Amino acid sequence: MSRFDNVAVTKQANVYFDGKCVSHTVEFADGTKKSVGVILPSTLTFNTGAPEVMETVAGACRVKLAGENEWKSYAAGQSFEVPANSSFEIEVAAEPYHYVCHFG
């Protein structure tokens, strides 16, 4: 799916890591929320409250989940899961990484 229909979008962006990650919150009619964003080339660490599924829309990244030793690579069309109350490192190298973060 390349678009979301019948949603509310928060106008003001969520800006993290001095602008290296920028996203917008999208709320669906059933109350569920997702964020749609871009990470510029960098290596960042994110903490999670709720479980997350990170869907790769464009670009590529490498990810290391908390407690793991190895990095795993993801490209457009792939996703990875992060448990609640955890963290992950993400490395974006060549071009911006476009994603949808599915919460819960």
Curated annotation (Swiss-Prot):
Which Gene Ontology molecular function entries are recorded, alphabetically?
A: guanosine phosphorylase activity; purine-nucleoside phosphorylase activity; thymidine phosphorylase activity; uridine phosphorylase activity
Report keywords, A-Z.
Glycosyltransferase, Transferase
Q: Which InterPro entries match?
A: Ppnp (IPR009664), RmlC-like_jellyroll (IPR014710), RmlC_Cupin_sf (IPR011051)
Q: List the disulfide bonds.
A: none
Question: What catalytic reaction does the record list?
Answer: a purine D-ribonucleoside + phosphate = a purine nucleobase + alpha-D-ribose 1-phosphate; adenosine + phosphate = alpha-D-ribose 1-phosphate + adenine; cytidine + phosphate = cytosine + alpha-D-ribose 1-phosphate; guanosine + phosphate = alpha-D-ribose 1-phosphate + guanine
GO cellular component terms, semicolon-separated: cytosol
Assigned EC number: 2.4.2.1, 2.4.2.2
Q: Which domain of life is it from?
A: Bacteria
Enzyme class, first EC level, given as a word: transferase
Which family does the entry's similarity section mention?
Answer: Belongs to the nucleoside phosphorylase PpnP family.
Query: Which HAMAP family does this chain map to?
Result: Nucleos_phosphorylase_PpnP
Which purpose does this protein serve, as stated in its record? Catalyzes the phosphorolysis of diverse nucleosides, yielding D-ribose 1-phosphate and the respective free bases. Can use uridine, adenosine, guanosine, cytidine, thymidine, inosine and xanthosine as substrates. Also catalyzes the reverse reactions.
What is the protein name given in its UniProt record?
A: Pyrimidine/purine nucleoside phosphorylase
Q: What is the lineage of its organism?
A: Bacteria, Pseudomonadati, Pseudomonadota, Betaproteobacteria, Nitrosomonadales
